[in-house]
Amino acid sequence: MKVLKFSAEWCAPCKMLQKTLDEMVLPYPVENIDIDKQPDLAGEFGIRGVPTLVLLTGEGVEQGRLVGGKSKADIMEWLS
């Protein structure tokens, strides 16, 4: 399992989410994806807004999605 974090440098909620993630011990690795630098990947996942977290299985199958700035509690509940 891994988490894809879709964000952009100009996105204030993305920066707040990154600070929240930095303070957490997550059960899965997080891969940061800048939608401006990797628009094809953002399109492949149908990203319509940032920040967006996508949980993937080891086979690359999407297990869940969380859109917008979220609290630590929201993120941990989503991952459980």
PLM region spans:
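Structural micro-motif
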Residues: 45-54
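Thiol-based oxidoreductase modules, predominantly thioredoxin-like and allied folds used
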Residues: 5-6, 25-40
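Local sequence-structure signature of Cys/Sec-based thiol-disulfide redox active-site neighborhoods
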Residues: 1-24
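Residue-level recognition of oxygen-bearing side chains
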Residues: 16, 40, 71
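Non-catalytic, surface beta->alpha helical segment in thiol-disulfide oxidoreductase systems
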Residues: 55-80
